[in-house]
Swiss-Prot record:
GO cellular component: chromatin; nucleus
GO molecular function, one term: sequence-specific double-stranded DNA binding
Taxonomic source organism: Homo sapiens (Human)
Protein name: Homeobox protein Nkx-6.3
Taxonomic lineage: Eukaryota, Metazoa, Chordata, Craniata, Vertebrata
Gene name per UniProt: NKX6-3
InterPro entries per record: HD, HD_metazoa, Homeobox_CS, Homeobox_NK-like, Homeodomain-like_sf, HTH_motif
Amino acid sequence: MESNLQGTFLLNNTPLAQFPEMKAPVCQYSVQNSFYKLSPPGLGPQLAAGTPHGITDILSRPVAAPNNSLLSGYPHVAGFGGLSSQGVYYSPQVGNFSKAGNEYPTRTRNCWADTGQDWRGGRQCSNTPDPLSDSIHKKKHTRPTFTGHQIFALEKTFEQTKYLAGPERARLAYSLGMTESQVKVWFQNRRTKWRKKSALEPSSSTPRAPGGAGAGAGGDRAPSENEDDEYNKPLDPDSDDEKIRLLLRKHRAAFSVLSLGAHSV
């Protein structure tokens, strides 16, 4: 009785009868067959023209098997024809498709190391040392300065001997609070200056006049020779100040070379 009322409602409902295109085309064939099989013989022709949306019709519909022909009409989905509806996401065939990003090899190095651009100066970054910067650092070496006491002791030692052996150089450096390399370099520079001075004064190397001609000429000696003789004498504690004054006046040029300035005498 309920089915008859539903069929009568569907036939008498004019708004639904005016829109036959609202029928579902996918399930039309299977639903119509179910109507012919399950409905009574008298209601089959009547319900065929309507839209089967009754409760009994919906519950009596068979489970539609997956139809591969529905997807075959679309060329971009045809490649998935062999996959079932239940195993689309878990089928082992899915593993055959290349994953996104496989065509891009992974970088083992840092991308910044390949670019090597300095964002401030735009210069190429490299690990090679800069020869210009190395030369600047090497030129920053300053010349050591010595005190008056150290210069006096060095000059006194140089007048006695122009060359120092290893033990003598070490002893002198220790007594003056200097390093052996400083003493060695100072003696090298002092010998160079001494050779230049000797080359510019050839008269000092000429022999003196003998005997009678030079007897009365003893007082005609140059002041520098008198100072040298006075300088070569042993030091006397009572006259050290005078000898230091003569030494500083004689070697005034040495102070200007060492950037110490000349002492007032």
